[in-house]
Design a protein with these regions (language model features):
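C-terminal intramolecular chaperone/autoprocessing and neck/assembly modules of extracellular spikes
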Residues: 3, 7-101, 108, 112-122
Length: 122
């Protein structure tokens, strides 16, 4: 059936859940306003995006094409989006859907849409 199949805790606070429906599995991170203090508009999204270095590559394992980012390069911009250390024992992993990534992309898109509207005289 549908519903929450797992709840993730940090100390005594719920920080996430895994929920399922008939057609989807969702990994949810807590985002309720009641858990947050000092809320403010996000600034610096342009610099965040400009610091990222999108790349293409060929995977060594099978020669297939890849597109995205190099984890240790992203770690310099967004440490919370990357797990592990450059040249560490374990290969690094990156969360492409991190809240920091999505929030900065949306903030910059909103800024650009506002600028286009101003330039178009709307």
């Amino acid at each position: 059936g549908a519903g929450t199949i797992a709840t993730i805790y940090s100390d005594t606070a719920i920080v996430g859940t895994i929920t399922v429906t008939a057609s989807a599995t969702a990994y949810n991170t807590s985002s309720d306003y009641r858990l947050k203090d000092n809320q403010a508009p996000l600034t610096g999204s342009g610099a965040f995006i400009d610091a990222l270095q999108p790349k293409t590559w060929t995977w060594k394992a099978d020669g297939s094409a890849g597109v995205g980012f190099i984890a240790h390069e992203v770690q310099e911009v967004s440490p919370s989006s990357v797990v592990g250390e450059k040249d560490g024992e374990q290969m690094q992993a990156m969360e492409y859907g991190s809240a920091e990534f999505i929030a900065n992309i949306i903030a910059e898109l909103q800024s650009l849409r506002k600028r286009v509207a101003q330039l178009e005289g709307k």
